[in-house]
From Swiss-Prot:
Biological classification of the source: Eukaryota, Metazoa, Ecdysozoa, Arthropoda, Hexapoda
Modified residues (Pyrrolidone carboxylic acid): Q20
GO biological process: neuropeptide signaling pathway; positive regulation of heart contraction
Protein name as catalogued: Pro-corazonin
Species this protein is from: Agrotis ipsilon (Black cutworm moth)
Compartmental location: Secreted
Main location: secreted
Pfam annotation, one family: Corazonin
Residues that bear Asparagine amide: N30
Propeptide, residue positions: 34-103
Record keyword Signal present: yes
Family in the record: Belongs to the corazonin family.
GO cellular component: extracellular region
GO molecular function, one term: corazonin receptor binding
Tissue: Expressed in corpora cardiaca (CC), corpora allata (CA), antennal lobe (AL) and gnathal ganglion (GNG) (at protein level). Expression in CC and CA detected in all animals, expression in AL and in GNG in some animals.
C-alpha cells in the first residue's frame, strides 16, 4: 500500500515539474508568446492596428472575436453606421426582409 502511495506522489511531482517547465519555456510567459519570430512588416501591422481600423471596425472585430452571433448590424458597412441617420432603405423591417430573401 505504501509503495503505491509513494509511486503516486512521485508521479504527481514529476507531472507538476514537467508542466511548469513547459509553461516557462520558449518565451511563453503569462499567456503571451514571444513575437521575435514575426517578420518586421507583420510587427508593424500589429502595432499600427489602431491607425488601420476605424472604431466601428474595431467594435465589430471585438464582437466577432468574443464569439457572439452574427447579426444584421454586423453586415451593414461602417460608413453607413457612422452616419447619424440611417438611409430610409436600411430600416430594420427592410433589413429583415432582405435577409429572409437570402436564407
Amino acid at each position: 500500500m505504501s509503495a503505491n502511495v509513494t509511486l503516486l506522489l512521485i508521479f504527481v511531482t514529476l507531472a507538476s515539474v514537467t508542466a511548469q517547465t513547459f509553461q516557462y519555456s520558449r518565451g511563453w510567459t503569462n499567456g503571451k508568446r514571444d513575437q521575435g519570430h514575426l517578420r518586421p512588416e507583420l510587427k508593424e501591422l500589429i502595432n499600427n492596428m489602431d491607425k488601420i481600423l476605424s472604431p466601428c471596425q474595431k467594435n465589430k472585430l471585438k464582437y466577432l472575436l468574443e464569439g457572439k452571433p452574427v447579426t444584421e448590424r454586423l453586415l451593414i458597412p461602417c460608413d453607413i453606421l457612422d452616419t447619424e441617420e440611417y438611409p430610409r432603405a436600411l430600416t430594420e423591417r427592410n433589413l429583415n426582409a432582405m435577409m429572409d430573401a437570402f436564407y
